[in-house]
Amino acid sequence: MDYTFLKEDESFRSELHDFFLRELPDDWTGSLGDSESDWEFTLKIRQKMAQEGWLSMAWPKEYGGQEASIIKQVIFAEEVEYNRVPGRDAFGVRMLAPTLMIHGTEEQKREHLPKIARGEIQWCQGYSEPGSGSDLASLETRAVEDGDDYVINGTKVWTSMAHRADQMFMMARTDPDAPKHRGISFFLLDMKAPGVEVQAIINMVGNHHFNMINFEDVRVPKKNLVGEVNRGWYVGATLLDFERSGIEYSASARRVIEELIDFSNETYRNGCLISDDPIIRHRLAKLRTEIEMSRLISYQIGYMQSQGIVPNKESSIGKVFGTELQQKIAKLGMQILGMYGQLAVSYTHLPLPPSDLV
């Protein structure tokens, strides 16, 4: 593909930068907690981006989109992540919406896609379970057919944003006797349905992001089955292709490496600038090169999507490469920052803005 951006693409970047300067506080670092005021700010930014049509710009107009290029959508995702802008519901916008366009019924598309485009709804993902993580196909949550519904019982865990979510997309086992990849179905579930219990999982620094979800006789209408019964694995795999295909990995990594480079160029240790250490320079340069590789992989994936190609193996490559890259940057960041890396986010004299990586 041609990696040269059009003038209109660069103009769009400038438009996004102007929006960020206008809507974000002057001292914005990208760090938000889970307070009600933080969530309200997230929703406020989401609504403004939705009003601009940015959440769904590459979608068909009939579902709330602008039919813009996929590459333009990639630029939006990159700039939002690089600038640590809140508000974009990746579960709905990046993962579920394109999956519904492939596997959903017309009724499902018309019911859910416009709400996502307008920024009116928060989704969460019901995949991992206490006994099934990496081996997702070993999931045990059951969905039993009963009249016009399926009745769901089981548990999901590590569910991000479930305490804020209106809806969940999930996989459940509909045929326990079938081979494990064949007896799974994909559902859309109302988080306020009777029998849904959300339990907070508080991490070691006191943050609430993950949850455990218990389902006790939760009724899901058959119209909320996405794709064919017992073939939900393929729907879920499509969704994972979209989840893994994002440019977010390289964008967030690029922001952190630039901050580490600035810190190294400005900070003395043992009488010398940190950046004068040839080992540090080499490691920073190597990671900066790998970030550009990750970025180009994401652009290639975006190009494939623009040609109507589902980037199956390419998405997995991008996910593994991007995640490992972030881990390398976090490790180097801790080495460069030293004891500064142990400071709490609330500490007044943090040398770098708070980040998900360092």
Regions from the PLM with identified roles:
Residues 348-354:
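Conserved small/polar residues in nucleotide/adenosyl-binding loops
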Residues 3-7, 196-293:
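Glycine-rich beta->alpha junctions and the first turn(s) of the following alpha-helix
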Residues 1-8, 344-347:
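Intrinsic disorder at enzyme termini
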Residues 50-119, 161-167, 291, 305-313, ...:
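Internal helix-loop-helix
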